[in-house]
C-alpha cells in the first residue's frame, strides 16, 4: 500500500515512517506537550523512545497508565496535570482507550469544574487542547472521529499518524478483537432501513477487507500489507464516511 494523506476533517497521515513528520505538525519549539499513553506497550515496541527523540525540542510531560475503558479518576489526574503545567498540546500514543481519554482530557483542561460534568452534558464543552493521535491498534476508529467518552466537534484530533509497523506486535487475540470492532462499527451503519448504493459498496469493501486480511495478519504479524489494510479500514468505521446518505 502506498502512503497517503487525507483530511476529513482530521489530517490523517498514513504509512511506514510517517512518524518522522511529527515535529513539523506541532506548535512552536519549546511548547509544553503532554505525552499520554497506556501501559508499557509503546515502550516495548520502541515507540516511546522514538517519540521522545522527535519531541526533544519540547518540554514533555509523561502521563501513563490510561487503562482500557478509562476511569474518570484517571481523566481527572491528567486534567490536573495539564492545568498545573499549562500544557499547549497533547500527543496521544496508543489505541482507542488512550485516544478517547485524551479527548476528555483536552476538553477538561479548559473547564473550571469536574471533567465528569462534560460526560453528562456535552454542551458544557468549550475549548479543547489540540492533540495528535499516534495509533497502535487497528480497531475503534478513535483516531478519526470526535467521539469516545464524550462527543463534540472540538474533539477531533488535529492530526493522526498511522504507521502499520507499530501494530506488528499486536497479538492474535487482540488483532481478532480489533477486527471484530471494525466489523461491528461497519454493520451499525450498513444494516439500516434505507441504504445508499455508494455507501453500501464502501461498507461491503470494508467488510471484505477485514475478512481477507485479518487471517493474514494473524498468520504473519509483520505482514505490512495486511496490517496496513486493517489500519486503513479501522479509521473509516467511525468517521462518518460510511453513513453518507443514510
Name every feature range the model reports, one short phrase each.
Residues 20, 111-197:
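A glycine/threonine-rich phosphate-anchoring loop and its flanking beta-alpha core
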Residues 1-89:
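ATP/NTP phosphate-donor binding region
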Residues 67, 93-95, 122, 245-246:
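Active-site nucleophile and cofactor-binding loops and adjacent substrate-binding regions
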Residues 189-246:
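Active-site segments that bind and position negatively charged phosphate/pyrophosphate groups
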Residues 11-12, 32-34, 61, 88-91, ...:
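Structural motif
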Residues 87-105, 136-142:
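Glycine/serine-rich anion-binding loops at beta->alpha junctions
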Residues 78-79, 98-112, 144-145:
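Short Gly/Thr/Asp-enriched flexible loops that form oxyanion-binding sites at enzyme active sites
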Amino acid at each position: 500500500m502506498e502512503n497517503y494523506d487525507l483530511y476529513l476533517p482530521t489530517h490523517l497521515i498514513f504509512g511506514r515512517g510517517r512518524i518522522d513528520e511529527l515535529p513539523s505538525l506541532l506548535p512552536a519549539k519549546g511548547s509544553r506537550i503532554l505525552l499520554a499513553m497506556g501501559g508499557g506497550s509503546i515502550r516495548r515496541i520502541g515507540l516511546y523512545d522514538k517519540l521522545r527523540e522527535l519531541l526533544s525540542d519540547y518540554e514533555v510531560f509523561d502521563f501513563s497508565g490510561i487503562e482500557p475503558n478509562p476511569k474518570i479518576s484517571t481523566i481527572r489526574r491528567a486534567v490536573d496535570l495539564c492545568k498545573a503545567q499549562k500544557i499547549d498540546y497533547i500527543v496521544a500514543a496508543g489505541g482507542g482507550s488512550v485516544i478517547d481519554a485524551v479527548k476528555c482530557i483536552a476538553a477538561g483542561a479548559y473547564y473550571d469544574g469536574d471533567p465528569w460534568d462534560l460526560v453528562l452534558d456535552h454542551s458544557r464543552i468549550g475549548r479543547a487542547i489540540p492533540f495528535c493521535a499516534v495509533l497502535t491498534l487497528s480497531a475503534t476508529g478513535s483516531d478519526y472521529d470526535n467521539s469516545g467518552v464524550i462527543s463534540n466537534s472540538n474533539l477531533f484530533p488535529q492530526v493522526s499518524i498511522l504507521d502499520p509497523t507499530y501494530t506488528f506486535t499486536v497479538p492474535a487475540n487482540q488483532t481478532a478483537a480489533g477486527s471484530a470492532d471494525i466489523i461491528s462499527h461497519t454493520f451499525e451503519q450498513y444494516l439500516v432501513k434505507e441504504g445508499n448504493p455508494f455507501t453500501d459498496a464502501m461498507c461491503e469493501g470494508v467488510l471484505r477487507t477485514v475478512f481477507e486480511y485479518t487471517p493474514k495478519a494473524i498468520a504473519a504479524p509483520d505482514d505490512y500489507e495486511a496490517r496496513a489494510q486493517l489500519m486503513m479500514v479501522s479509521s473509516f468505521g467511525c468517521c462518518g464516511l460510511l453513513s453518507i446518505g443514510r
